[in-house]
From Swiss-Prot:
Keywords: Disulfide bond, Knottin, Neurotoxin, Secreted, Signal, Toxin. It comes from Conus arenatus. It comes from the Eukaryota. Expressed by the venom duct. Disulfide bonds join 50-65, 57-68, 64-73. This is Conotoxin ArMKLT2-0122. Pfam families: Conotoxin. Residues 23-44 form a propeptide. The presence of a 'disulfide through disulfide knot' structurally defines this protein as a knottin. The cysteine framework is VI/VII (C-C-CC-C-C).
Length: 77
C-alpha cells in the first residue's frame, strides 16, 4: 500500500514537472512575427539614436537600449 502511494505521488510529481517545463510554441511564433515587423520598420534614420552595445547608459537615456544593467547597455537591437 505504501509503495503504491509513493508511486502515485512520484508520477504526479513528474507529470507536474513536465507541464511546467513545456514550451508554449504559440508564444514563439507571435514574438518572431513581432521581431520581424520591428526589423522592417527600423531604417537608417531610426537607428542613428541607438547606443552601441556595452556603452554607458542611464535608465531613461535611450529607447534602443532595452537592458541597462550597471550603467551598461547590454542589448541594442
Amino acid at each position: 500500500m505504501k509503495l503504491t502511494c509513493v508511486l502515485i505521488v512520484a508520477v504526479l510529481f513528474l507529470t507536474a514537472c513536465q507541464l511546467i517545463a513545456a514550451d508554449d510554441s504559440r508564444d514563439l511564433k507571435r514574438f518572431s512575427r513581432r521581431k520581424m515587423r520591428d526589423g522592417m520598420l527600423n531604417t537608417k534614420n531610426t537607428e542613428e539614436g541607438c547606443l552601441p552595445p556595452l556603452s554607458l547608459c542611464t535608465m531613461a537615456d535611450d529607447e534602443c537600449c532595452h537592458d541597462c544593467i550597471l550603467f551598461l547597455c547590454l542589448v541594442s537591437p
